[in-house]
Amino acid sequence: MAPTTDRSSLEITDFPDDDFLPATTATVKSYQLNRFTRPLIDYVHNEWQANTKYVSLSGSPDGGADSPRWMQMFLSMVTAPRFRRYTLIYLVLLASCLAGWTLVLSPRLEENQWLEHSLDPQTQEEAGGWFGTNTMPRFEGVTHMRTLDKIFLPAVKAVKGEASSRRLIFIGDVHGCRDELELLLDEVSFDHERDHLIFTGDMISKGPDSPGVVDLARQYAASCVRGNHEDRILLLRHDMATTNTLPAASDGDIPPDLFFGLNSKERALARQLSDEQVQWLDACPVILDVGQIPAMGQVLVVHGGLVPGVALEKQDPSSVMNMLTIDLDTHVPSGKRGGMMWTKLFNKHQSLLYASQKGVVPDPKSKVTTVIYGHDAKTSLSLKTYTKGLDSGCVKGGKLTAMIIEDGGEQKVVQVRCRNYHHNQ
């Protein structure tokens, strides 16, 4: 039997090379290293033990032993990197919430409150009646309202997989840009047999070919409304005919205060239009009643806008052609900016009307009104629930816009880019 070895008596010796050790000797060496060296955990260095980030800030040699326990915990928490990161994140979130409330939510809530107050019947009594509640004066030679023939209306329901049987194509302010108008008609694949064009006013003036735009509209038997620029040119034309200044004459012979101070280009356009073109433009109403369209209710076309809550026959023609803003107390419209946009008040009025009809009538949408308009090039294309603004500043290098309504009331918008003719004015 092989002699046994007392392993506890072995000492660590230097061996030249483990490869030359017998197996039993190597085993003994490994054992000796594990037995007499320090445990591996003693060689682990934890950074937190010596890092100043985790040292108490009390300043006492014993790490703040004299400080209250709660203060030590507070100081340790504040000096922790994670606490500082979370604090920064929460401060950013708080600042974002305050900014959102101050800049977005609070102004909208305040505006909504003012709109509801403006439409309150008690406000009407306090103001002594809203603008337009009394019958407005009629303008001689101006067609106030006209109704579109129902044969032009799209079908109430669309047939899946089939092309629309009828389309209404509403076109924003053209301002004499005939080339862009023809391009837009190509873009929408205009078909005279099934499509009907409706212009939202300001077909003429400013651009290079106003008579050409009128001829194109007449060629396709389009419908239109009277815009503020048609109104100016037509009034000028009729005054010229009355004062025998219609034939080409030297502007030097015309008093400077005659014809509302209109410039020479407008006077030239008034002379340039033919009698047939003037007659066609004169027939354009201030308000066009398109009729009932699914999901849109009663659709009206005007150039400027409408005062909500006032019957169509009592709307002021001049305001309908020129309005941009509206006074919330008296509902007096204005052609200047800086006040409440008439579209906001109109949309609020219609939304309240729709809410009042829900559950009362089978189709509450049929009781509301949607207005399609032009005139507001600064706001450009503006498609709200009950107002659709189509003037996108074509004559100044913007776009010419067409809004297409197909069977079932489906809507889509098509635009083409325009050259800038503003520098020629």
Annotate each language-model stretch with its function.
Residues 173, 202, 217, 227-228, ...:
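Divalent metal-coordination and catalytic microenvironments
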Residues 210-300, 304-336:
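Active-site neighborhood of divalent metal-dependent phosphoester bond hydrolases
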Residues 2-145, 317-425:
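Acidic, His/Gly-rich catalytic cores of divalent-metal-dependent hydrolytic chemistry
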Residues 167-173, 299-305, 388-390:
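Active-site-proximal beta-strand elements of phosphoester/diester hydrolases
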Residues 196-201, 260-264, 339-344:
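Short, basic, glycine/proline-bearing loop/turn elements
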Residues 175-179, 205-208, 231-234, 308-309, ...:
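Active-site environment of divalent metal-dependent phosphoester hydrolases
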Residues 114-212:
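N-terminal active-site segment of His-dependent metallophosphoesterases
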Residues 162-168, 290-300, 384:
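Beta-strand-turn-beta hairpins that frame and shape the catalytic cleft
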